[in-house]
Every structure is written in C-alpha cells, then in structure tokens.
Amino acid sequence: INNNKKILPTLKSRCLNFKISLTYNQSINITNKLLNEKLNNFLNDEFITNYSTPGQLLKMINFAIVNDINLKNLNLKSLISKIILDKKYKKDVSIKDLIYSLIELYFRNNVSIKNIELINMYNYFLKKINNTKTFNLDEESLFMEFKDKVLHE
C-alpha cells in the first residue's frame, strides 16, 4: 500500500487505518514464508535492515527478477548505480520509491559522526528528495547529482 498519497478527508473519515509494526525477525519470517525460501538466498545482507518491511523486500526481489539482476552478489552502491545508469526509474513508478529507499539506506549504512561531509550530504539529499516528490521535479537530475557527488562515479 502506498500511503504517501493524500486521501480526501471525507474518504479518510470512513476508512479504518491499521498501523502495524513488525520486528526485524517478524519481517524476515513473513518474507521467508511468502518466498517459500530463505531471504538470504535472494538478497545480500546489506539490503536487509531493521527498517525493511516484507513488501519492500518482495518488491526489491521482483525488481531483480524482472531485470535479471543478482542481488545476492551485488552491493548497495552498485545497485543504485545500475538503476540510475539504466534509467529503470523512468519505466516504473515503484522503482522510484525503491531507489529513494536505497539512497536513504546507503546513507544510513555509511554515515558516521566522524564523516561530517557525508552527514551534510545526507541532509541535503533528503531535502532534495522531499522537494522532488512534493513539487514533482525531475528525478533524473537528482539521481545524476547523487551519483556524481556521493557515489563518485
């Protein structure tokens, strides 16, 4: 479910809204059951975090299957670069959400107190992503800037 979209107040008042929080182990177990296989057979451990939901993990796996990408042998930086270079985000809206999540995950994995420059880049790109979503700006310039400034490619 994409809860980022605005819902009219009249509709919202007539709906039940369930907020479910899963632990890390619950997310992994649910995903394993949905796949009928271990999640680690599909994904590099770098992609699995405490914030991962079964839906996000399944979307990532489906994306990899459709695009013939082996996520087990690919790291996060390489996957982000591949999505940006191949412009996969232009073909499917769900890929945009995926790449935004991957960018945030990249920063979360690499930001440290000692690296002030990366913390500043993290804040800068979070604001830029928010503005891109809010004002419907061009994603390509955002992703190219991220690739150049952060991934250094």
State each model region's role.
Residues 1-11:
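Sensor-1/coupling segment of RecA-like P-loop NTPase cores
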Residues 16-28:
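Conserved AAA+ ATPase "SRH/arginine-finger" region at the nucleotide-binding site
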Residues 25, 32-153:
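AAA+ P-loop NTPase domains with strong preference for DNA replication initiators
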